[in-house]
Amino acid sequence: MIPADDYPVTELTKALIARPSVTPLDEGCQTLMAERLSAIGFNIEPMVFEDTTNMWARRGNEGPVFCFAGHTDVVPTGDVSRWHTPPFVPTIIDGYLYGRGAADMKGSLAAMVIATERFVAKHPDHNGSIAFLITSDEEGPFINGTTRVIDTLEARNEKITWALVGEPSSTLKLGDVVKNGRRGSLTGNLIVKGIQGHVAYPHLADNPIHKAAPFLAELSQMHWDNGNEFFPPTSFQIANINGGTGASNVIPGALDVMFNFRYSTEVTAEILIERVEALLKAHELGYDISWIFNGLPFLTGDGPLLDATRIAIRQVTGYETDPQTTGGTSDGRFIAPTGAKVLELGPVNATIHKVNECVKVDDLEQLALCYEVILEQLLC
């Protein structure tokens, strides 16, 4: 029996972690993956946009197209002195592999490659096509990554049928949760206008903080929707608020407020914008506002992809998975609008973005097995 430390998926994960690919850097991770995929018949298409390295790899010319999607970039390490081991020196301690990106998401990338190698060895004449969509711009501004690759594919009418994103979806144990959808995300940047002046002469000024306070209080208490069986109710949160010069004797001339909606399929971004701007007008505020669309909500219901994933997790782990739509956004939001069915399955997310990020070594092998079974269910 192969020791867990020597699993092929463990070795590949370690090789990826050793490349310090802090967003938007790739540091050769995609080249390493491409070499493995090219050896089993994949056509490799690098797509570099500005500072971002992307890869579209495909084996086969027919549909349906099953796509593994993920990212090679990682978040910064934070205070290195707080790490038990150097963050880019992959180290196994008590059955856990430590290193930045171990769980988010170099372990998933390695599992995808290993699963595909095994699947192709067993089924060289599989149905349809297998693809990889990999970017180095998921943890950053997500401008030149997956969204640009999707634009390229759409322009030539190259469609993805099913996409499996390797984001760390699991909560307590591998596969206990999969993400079969995500809420939409909409950010508002609001400037409430006033007139700067001396605090001793308020009649000669117009305090935007005083003017905006009742509006913000009402906005924060508004009911947006009730959610549904798949999504919680839409949430509104103020993320940043700034006004004033820092002096105690100056009434500010403007108030800057940044806020975010995480919204369900019960509303649209257009409805949210309309309601916010109607409230601004009702409070008779002078303002400028700009909106950033971070992603539409999407949902993958019962069907081949979710069914195959349920079967794989049950077969490999012995328990049932729980499909959820909670949490933040992922690059799945750029793939779903094309009509693809999108699902997220990856390691336990307890340590992602933290110091001492780690993944259970045995989970990496189980994840590779899950991915392999999913391929068998969909392409055999």
Curated annotation (Swiss-Prot):
Record-level Gene Ontology MF annotations: acetylornithine deacetylase activity; cobalt ion binding; succinyl-diaminopimelate desuccinylase activity; zinc ion binding
UniProt remark on cofactor binding: Binds 2 Zn(2+) or Co(2+) ions per subunit.
Enzyme Commission code: 3.5.1.18
Cofactor needs: Zn(2+); Co(2+)
Chain sites annotated for binding Zn(2+) 1: 71, 104, 167
Active site: 73, 138 (proton acceptor)
Pfam entry (one): Peptidase_M20
Signal peptide (from-to): none
Keywords from the named record: Amino-acid biosynthesis, Cobalt, Diaminopimelate biosynthesis, Hydrolase, Lysine biosynthesis, Metal-binding, Zinc
Record keyword rRNA-binding present: no
Catalytic activities: N-succinyl-(2S,6S)-2,6-diaminopimelate + H2O = (2S,6S)-2,6-diaminopimelate + succinate
Binding site residues for Zn(2+) 2: 104, 139, 353
Biological process (GO), any one: diaminopimelate biosynthetic process
Annotated metabolic or biological route of this protein: Amino-acid biosynthesis; L-lysine biosynthesis via DAP pathway; LL-2,6-diaminopimelate from (S)-tetrahydrodipicolinate (succinylase route): step 3/3
Subunit and partners: Homodimer.
Alphabetical list of NCBIfam families matching this protein: dapE_proteo, PRK13009.1
Family, per entry: Belongs to the peptidase M20A family. DapE subfamily.
Role noted for this protein: Catalyzes the hydrolysis of N-succinyl-L,L-diaminopimelic acid (SDAP), forming succinate and LL-2,6-diaminopimelate (DAP), an intermediate involved in the bacterial biosynthesis of lysine and meso-diaminopimelic acid, an essential component of bacterial cell walls.
Name listed for the protein in its UniProt record: Succinyl-diaminopimelate desuccinylase
Organism in which the protein naturally occurs: Shewanella baltica (strain OS185)
Lineage: Bacteria, Pseudomonadati, Pseudomonadota, Gammaproteobacteria, Alteromonadales
